[in-house]
Design a protein with these regions (language model features):
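CBM-like, beta-strand-rich accessory domains located in the C-terminal region of large
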Residues: 19-21, 335, 544, 549-560, ...
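Extracellular carbohydrate-recognition regions
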Residues: 20-41, 169, 177-178
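Extra-cytoplasmic beta-strand recognition segments
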Residues: 26-30, 34, 70-104, 133-141, ...
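Extracellular glycan-recognition surfaces and repeat-rich motifs
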Residues: 29-60, 65
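Extracellular carbohydrate recognition and processing domains
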Residues: 112-145
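Extracellular carbohydrate recognition
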Residues: 155-171
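Active-site lining segments of carbohydrate-active enzymes
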Residues: 321-445, 456, 574-582
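Carbohydrate-active enzyme catalytic cores, enriched for enzymes
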Residues: 455-641, 695-697, 705, 806-808
Length: 821
């Protein structure tokens, strides 16, 4: 029989823990039955069958598809900033439809439960554990902690679960012990389709023995001297000189761990994102100049990279599996670094020491390639490599990077073929993320990021197989629509709506349009004129030492990665593809994505009309979702005066349970109705359906049924009607609502412009010499207007013109008319 205890491992810095020794958690081995624990509805019982040692243990049985189990310890005093280790034995004999968690419940002095910096719960998730196993769960208590308890809870909708627990021990660790303490890693595995041996053999036959290379080595002076004659070469060399003269900020372990303490991503990532553009610039400058003066800095940075504990962004290593060398896996950042290293190795060739080149290959294999190869061979996907069967940009970006590294670095043709086979499987998942009409719910930025890498992958594979494998042919009808999205989503040639997590200045990257021009010219309405090779393929990031952040200086590159495009576009002639398209052509009068749920209306040939509008339906469970059904962007020329505010600055909470507490993510920060005091709900059932779509030369009319976006029992009807009078340059937005009983109702206009009320219900929005006149009215009661600044981390901050009925209404209409005069 085990003695119930709380282990207190103390130092003078942790005297607060000493106070809690008088209140130890009772009955951690369950030998006293339920003493010290609070049970639930019969799902959690103490019984002999669940004992690991002694006579009794805890058994959780859950066959309830509605709610989970609940078994909680007594509460004891605790202290902020203290690292606690819960050690216990567990046995879950079979896989189930759900999971179970062991939680730390940290509370503040008000009794409120505290969350992690990213807004998530402090929990340790368990799935199948066929044999009894001792596990460690380690957490550091958050700020304002005054107490803790242990909670064992099977997740809602779990069925078929039997889980046994016994012999818990709770320890308060010293700072020295906390440095090396970590939770036991329990990989959650899901099936991944395995390619057949026959298909792998077919792919192997397509591969030459010679490895693919992302461009020629430096000693191909004909190619590099031709690039050196490019006017942009001097700019690149000048940037490289500036990089040499600027002290390099180290990426320390302390900076890496800062995210896990604070949830702030930028502390590490502002420095992290300097590495690639800087070393790319140094490497290309060295190849152009061929004097050796940039080589020492390149070698030093590559050696430092090899010695780093993790190549990931900390936000993608939340359990510190990479950092603690428990499990390596690839993310956006590490796979980008791998591609960068692979490319620099190919270009600089024997300028790099052979020992360094071998070390680089070993690190790429260990950190990136081997974990993926394990999935291909086992058919089991660890949770950390979720992107391999994901449907968003991560899939295309990481698959491109991983496949390119394999094709360039693995001598064995059969193994290269295994990566191609895995790529084919992942590609199918990625393409299901697009709607049938080609719409990308992630928004324009991530369309360019994901689809751009997919097109780069297609060119890479085509080159690496000597033209034998073209991954674009199998899905050509859908891919043509996805390619067309880049044009159809544009309001003007210089403006796209920043729906989802997009920057306000979002626009299709030129590199992506050039790749589309190669393979899908019919998806473009006009020519994409190539700049000089170095001009459009090299990174344009600079570091602002005063602001302590990396500044993006132009849309020249694929956000996190630039070398993939350089290897494809930088050594050829894109003019031959451009010649097949007209020099210029107007955008169509309208674009409609029926399954994506977006309408774009433009002036067409009416030179007197400068208005355009993008109106969004869709649903509230999209990739990079915002609760924004009914949101719209209304522009005068290239200036959006009614604006979707785009993405919030990313933090540890951006993709957690706290996401929709941010105004830019929830409906408060969008130009949509505020109904009965409630915001829009989240989820697939929250949907905006276009019930009317009428398009003509003179007028477009669309109606969205928005009722399903709000969880309000009294709501009978809510529609938004947009009328685009192309001939007279007038846009009208009309919101119609009906309740079963009187309720509060209003709507809003969000803008970055100056907002001025000229008369009751008449407003002027003005920015950058463009002006929008707005008349807001209703015959169903007086309206109240209120301009407030939205709470957000972005700058400048958008403002919200609230438009609300003074009194509750049963049936009402609000009409907003927009003109330029």
């Amino acid at each position: 029989m085990h003695t119930t205890r709380i282990m207190m491992i103390l130092s003078s810095l942790y005297l607060p823990c000493l106070a809690s020794s008088n209140l130890p958690l009772e009955n951690l081995d369950f030998e006293q039955g339920m003493a010290g624990w609070t049970g639930d509805n019969g799902k959690s019982v103490v019984c002999p069958q669940a004992a690991h040692s002694g006579k009794l243990g805890l058994r959780v049985t859950d066959n309830d598809p509605q709610s989970g189990s609940s078994f909680r310890s007594q509460t004891i005093p605790a202290h902020e900033g203290t690292t606690y280790r819960l050690r216990f034995w567990a046995h879950i004999p079979k896989e189930t439809s759900g999971l179970i968690g062991v939680y730390f419940i940290f509370k503040d002095e008000k009794g409120s439960t505290l969350a992690r910096p990213d807004g998530s719960e402090y929990k340790f998730t368990l799935s199948c554990i066929p044999n009894w196993r001792q596990l460690d769960y380690v957490e550091t208590s958050p700020k304002n902690t005054v107490s803790l308890a242990i909670w064992i809870h099977s997740f809602n909708a779990t069925t078929g679960l039997t889980a046994d627990f016994d012999d818990f021990e709770l320890a308060c660790l010293t700072p020295q012990e906390a440095q090396n303490a970590c939770s036991t890693w329990l990989p959650v595995k899901t099936p991944f389709p395995k390619s057949s041996p026959q298909r792998i053999a077919e792919l192997e036959a397509m591969l030459p023995y010679k490895l693919w290379k992302p461009g020629p080595p430096f000693h191909d002076r004909y190619t590099w001297d031709r690039l050196a004659a490019d006017p942009a070469a001097n700019v690149i060399i000048s940037r490289a000189e500036k990089i040499l003269a600027t002290p390099q900020q180290p990426l320390t372990d302390e900076l890496y761990l800062d995210f896990h303490r604070t949830g702030i991503r930028t502390t590490y990532e502002n420095i992290y994102h300097r590495w690639e553009p800087e070393i790319q610039t140094l490497a290309v400058a060295e190849c152009l100049e061929n004097k050796g003066r940039f080589l020492p800095a390149i070698i030093r940075r590559l050696e430092e990279l090899c010695n780093m504990r993790s190549w990931l962004m900390p936000a993608h290593d939340r359990e510190l599996l990479n950092f603690n060398n428990i499990q390596c896996y690839a993310d956006l950042g590490s796979s980008a670094r791998g591609w960068t290293v692979m490319s620099i190795d190919a270009w600089l060739d024997d300028k790099l020491p052979q020992s360094l080149r071998e070390r680089l290959r070993q690190e790429i294999h260990r950190r990136i390639l081997q974990p993926c190869l394990d999935v291909f061979r086992s058919g089991e996907l660890i949770n950390e490599l979720w992107w391999m069967n994901g449907t968003n940009n991560w899939n295309a970006v990481c698959t491109n990077n991983v496949t390119g590294m394999a094709l360039a670095l693995i001598p064995d043709k059969h193994v290269r073929a295994e990566f191609l086979a895995g790529m084919e499987i992942s590609n199918k998942f990625f393409l299901t993320g697009f709607r049938e009409d080609g719409y990308c719910t992630e928004g324009v930025s991530y369309w360019g990021f994901g689809f751009g890498h997919f097109l780069t992958l297609a060119e890479t594979v085509l080159q690496a197989t000597d033209g034998k494998l073209d991954i674009l042919k199998k899905q050509y009808p859908l891919l043509e629509k996805v390619a067309r999205y880049g044009t159809d989503i544009q309001l003007t040639r210089r403006l796209s709506p920043p729906f989802a997590d997009c920057r306000l200045t979002v626009f299709p990257f030129k590199e992506v349009l050039l790749l589309i021009q190669r393979r899908f010219p019919q998806a473009l309405t006009q020519r994409v004129n190539p700049d000089t090779p170095l001009g459009y393929t090299m990174p344009t990031f600079e570091y602002d030492a005063v602001a302590h952040k990396t500044i993006f200086c132009g849309s020249s590159g694929l956000v996190l990665e630039h070398i993939p495009c350089f290897g494809i576009l930088g050594f050829g002639d894109e003019n031959r593809y451009a010649a097949a398209l007209p020099e210029s052509a107007p955008l169509p009068q309208h674009s409609f994505f029926p399954t994506g749920g977006v309408v774009i209306c433009r002036p067409g040939d009416n030179s007197a009309n400068h208005l355009s509008i993008a109106l969004k339906g869709g649903h509230n469970a999209e990739h990079h979702n915002h609760n924004d059904i009914g949101s719209f962007v209304l522009a005068v020329g290239d200036e959006p005066l009614i604006q979707d505010p785009g993405r919030e600055e990313y933090s540890g909470q951006t993709f957690g349970v706290a996401r929709y507490t941010f105004p830019l993510m929830n409906s408060w920060g969008h130009s949509v109705p505020f109904v009965a005091g409630k915001l829009q709900k989240t989820g697939r059932q929250a949907e905006g359906i276009f019930t009317t779509t009428s398009f003509s030369e003179e007028k477009d009319v669309v109606v969205i049924d928005m009722k399903a976006a709000y969880d309000i029992p009294q709501l009978k009807k809510l529609t938004r009607t947009m009328t685009y009078d192309r001939k007279n340059a007038v846009i009208t937005i009309q919101d119609d609502v009906e309740f079963t009983s009187p309720q509060a109702f209003g709507t809003a206009l969000v803008s970055f412009a100056d907002i001025r009320e000229t008369a009751s219900g008449h407003f002027i929005f003005k920015n950058n010499n463009e002006t929008l006149h707005t008349s807001i009215s209703s015959t169903d009661g007086p309206l109240l207007f209120n301009v407030t600044t939205l709470k957000t981390q972005i700058s400048p901050k958008p403002r919200r013109l609230g438009i609300d009925f003074q009194s509750p209404v049963t049936r009402a209409t609000i009409t907003m008319v927009f003109t330029t005069k």
